[in-house]
Amino acid sequence: MTSIKQEDLIQSIADALQYISYYHPVDYIKSLNAAYEREESPAAKEAMAQILINSRMCAEGHRPICQDTGIVTVFLEIGMNVRWDDATMGVEDMANEGVRRAYNYPDNKLRASVLADPAGKRINTRDNTPGVVNVKVVPGDTVEVIVAAKGGGSEAKSKFAMLNPSDSIVDWVLKTVPTMGAGWCPPGMLGIGIGGTAEKAMLLAKESLMEPIDINELKARGASNRAEELRLELFDKVNALGIGAQGLGGLTTVLDIKVKDFPTHAANLPVAMIPNCAATRHAHFTLDGSGPVMLDPPSLEDWPQITYDASKGTRVDLDTITPEDVASWTPGQTLLLNGKLLTGRDAAHKRMVEMLDKGEPLPVDLKGRFIYYVGPVDPVRDEVVGPAGPTTATRMDKFTRQVLEQTGLLGMVGKAERGPAAIEAIRDNKSAYLMAVGGSAYLVSKAIKAAKVVGFADLGMEAIYEFTVQDMPVTVAVDSTGESVHQTGPREWQARIGKIPVVVA
């Protein structure tokens, strides 16, 4: 019989969540660096470089890899011979107390993104609780723990289908992945759960993402069952789609494919697919009664030495920019933004549109301005703002035409692609949409020299800020004529991949 203290589980979960906020798993870094070295698409290679640079900066500075520090998932396997001598709460409450401590840790405060009353008032819980806690009771005398933090952009692209038993899983995946766009921040992993019931398939998919990246080892030894055959087939075929890093077109879309299966009803073939983004975050540890767990930090030698060359971009002064300047930009062009940049994401856009509909003045004049879709992490120490990477732009698509036409907004900055309606509005208003790299939040924050709230302060991280930026790197993703690199890039690279040998290191 092993005696484990309540405090040991709570503090171990809190420490692990802090750890994964700034340390990528080393297998991800090595796999991404290998993909970076063999990438032939300049835009995708540049995106991967920013992710790798950002990751090293976070490891050194102990600040979040991504501004979306995620909703927490905890997997607990509790041995039947474990005794909780001093417990005053259940294990789910212990896990949530660990989440609360981690996200409110003053030296590396993490962003609270969890909202209560999701179908109603959507009120921020302020401490990122509750997490999603999965508990199994198993033979043994230890507690096995996996903690993970999953951002909303990748979680939003989760898919499920109840296929017929005769349907092709491969065909469904290859049809579905292009519909996910780039909001899930590739390159990452796809977790696929097959069998059981609807909820079991989703759980299998999420569990599979906790496994290490080992596709090259699998290629070397060969498949030993149908699940491994699917992994190998899907890995090659998904990458052959040419979606590439950040959806810009390139050789690598996924670094691995994971498949877990479970027996199912004869009439069913449930299939779930969940992507893991470039900010993949998970840690595994065991409690054996000897006290809280201390996770060993990785060596900085595990990160490649890559530097960002700001001279490659065209400097833009946001304080003097004109429609003629915007019209001169070309798709895929790298810009370095300088000057005053407004922010606003889902809640701010919803409120702005409601005010416009009522004829009420907005808290800030948007005419001739650019707005950045971001919800930053709170600053610590001497920071003016915490990590401040872009959020998924398509969620603002339904607001785009009205905001452009009724406010005189000149352009937008966000993550991933825009949908057809937004692209049409951009073209009609001779606007532009610029893309910042998802997974480079700390790197972006270093370009922000001042920050102040100028509207909707009650929205917390979704308030409207005014940033003063210096050489903030972005890419022209949709130009004033409506040409989108997220359409042209993958199309070009899908064709090129079909004609060139793709070698996996």
Give residue spans per PLM region.
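C-terminal binding/interaction regions
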Residues: 249-257, 264-265, 278, 446-505
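Short, solvent-exposed amphipathic alpha-helical segments in soluble enzyme
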Residues: 163, 205-209, 272-276, 289-291, ...
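Short, structured beta-strand/loop micro-motifs enriched in basic residues and often containing a Trp
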Residues: 311-321
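Feature captures the catalytic cores and cofactor-binding loops of soluble hydro-lyases/lyases
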Residues: 209, 213-242, 246-249, 343-475
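Residue "hotspots" at secondary-structure boundaries inside conserved domains
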Residues: 324-327, 364
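Generic structural signal for buried aliphatic residues
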Residues: 335-337, 341
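Short, well-ordered loop/turn sites that connect or cap secondary structure elements
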Residues: 326-329, 335
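Non-transmembrane, aqueous-exposed alpha-helical and coiled segments at domain scale
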Residues: 1-192, 197-309, 405
